Amino acid sequence: SRPELDAKRVGCMGISGGGTVTTFAAAVEPRIKVAFVSGYLNTFLDSILSLSHCIDNYVPDILNWCEMYDVAGLIAPRPLFIESGDKDNIFPIEASVESYKRVKKVYETIGSPELVQQEVFDGEHSFWGKQGLPFCAKHLKA
């Protein structure tokens, strides 16, 4: 820990590969208080395993254990914001929306549906931030 940081206000955000890192890091690191995943939440079958990706996207035999939305569900009960471009050619929007619904069910089950949100924006595989940045600011407010 670092004395100049407020441990109650640590967030993590990233797009694409950064969304991968954010998802997995927030799933296992409880010191991350808010996660903002851009251009990543989907299914492994519809995205990572359907195209040729860089090697750091592959977790051997992961489908024997879980799907991408299962990993994202481990972030609960901490706030999670997900954004997806409706024309993303790497992470198809249909699978992103379906995966979000599955993550939302986790938050509903624990009684905190307001702590997870998704924004689908008009765009490709890019960062948007219009609703996500205010969401993070709200949940990291001192």
Language-model regions: role of each:
Residues 76-91, 121-123:
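Conserved strand-to-loop "acid loop" that flanks and positions the catalytic carboxylate
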Residues 10, 80, 115-117:
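Short, conserved active-site loop motifs that form the nucleotide-linked donor/cofactor pocket
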Residues 13, 38-39, 83, 121:
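Alpha/beta-hydrolase-fold catalytic nucleophile elbow
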Residues 1-16, 32:
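Gly/Ser-rich "nucleophile elbow"/oxyanion-hole loop immediately N-terminal to the catalytic nucleophile
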Residues 32-72, 77, 90-100, 108-112:
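Mobile cap/lid helix-loop segments that gate and shape the active-site cleft of serine hydrolases
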Residues 18, 42, 87-88, 124-125:
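Short, glycine-/Ser/Thr-/acidic-enriched flexible segments
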Residues 1, 19-30, 136:
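Short glycine-enriched nucleophile-adjacent loop
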